[in-house]
């Protein structure tokens, strides 16, 4: 797999000039999408977007992924969660919410559900931190560092929190200090732009992503 790198200027110009779809009808969602796009165009590879609970972070992420992929700004996006239930919830939203011309994100792009199987033909991979730990650090076939060129981290402030609903293989991370260290290892493994979504930025969150 070659590096997912190219001249980003045309994509940045496209995003600047293209209106956000009515799917993201809330002003805070539209402003958040534009803020992330501006930061990326200005060369930032780490962005933190703080949004109050209930303002539609998953809906914002859906609209943002659509624009970033449609513009060819990024080629393969990882949607990273810290627990399986959040990943399942997000995947169902990608499958069911109509975003453009009567189509859902999952109908427009190839999206892979939770799991440790990774296909080079996918556009969006939904995964937990724990499943990536297994694939990157406990596997004979780790992913290349350029496998993803964009990572969107849902509930980024919870990166240190132990998952009380861990599935098989996820309980190998025993304490919060170890989890935070592993969480940072996963994020720093890939040569990718990081976009963190959070309602309440914690100290470790701003240390990783910078201020919102």
Stretches with model-predicted labels:
Residues 1-76, 85, 89-101, 124, ...:
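ATP-dependent helicase/translocase motor core
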Residues 49, 79-80, 194-196:
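Structural beta-sheet core signal
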Residues 52-54, 82-84, 156, 199-202:
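An acidic- and aromatic-residue-enriched active-site/binding cleft used to recognize and process polar
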Residues 55, 81-85, 106-116, 129-134:
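Conserved helicase motor
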Residues 64, 93, 109-113, 136-140, ...:
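Short beta-alpha junctions and helix-cap segments that line functional grooves
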Residues 80, 126-128, 152:
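Structural motif
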Residues 110-125, 142:
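Conserved motor-coupling elements within RecA-like helicase/translocase cores
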Residues 133-140, 144-212:
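Signature of the SF2 helicase/ATPase Hel1-core->accessory helical subdomain module
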């Amino acid at each position: 797999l070659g590096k997912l790198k190219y001249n980003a200027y045309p994509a940045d110009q496209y995003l600047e000039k293209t209106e956000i779809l009515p799917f993201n009808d809330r002003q805070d969602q539209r402003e958040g999408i534009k803020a992330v796009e501006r930061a990326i165009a200005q060369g930032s590879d780490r962005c933190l977007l703080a949004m109050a609970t209930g303002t539609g972070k998953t809906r914002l992420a859906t609209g943002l992924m659509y624009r970033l992929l449609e513009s060819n700004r990024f080629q393969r996006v990882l949607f990273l969660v810290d627990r399986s239930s959040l990943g399942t919830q997000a995947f169902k939203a990608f499958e069911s919410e109509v975003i453009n011309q009567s189509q859902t994100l999952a109908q427009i792009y190839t999206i892979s559900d939770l799991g440790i199987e990774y296909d080079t033909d996918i556009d969006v991979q939904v995964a937990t931190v724990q499943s990536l730990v297994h694939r990157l650090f406990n596997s004979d076939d780790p992913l290349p560092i350029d496998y993803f060129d964009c990572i969107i981290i849902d509930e980024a402030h919870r990166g240190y929190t132990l998952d009380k609903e861990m599935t098989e293989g996820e309980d190998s991370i025993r304490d919060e200090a170890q989890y935070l260290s592993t969480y940072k290892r996963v994020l720093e493994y890939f040569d990718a732009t990081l976009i963190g979504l959070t309602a309440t930025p914690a100290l470790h969150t701003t240390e990783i992503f910078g201020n919102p």
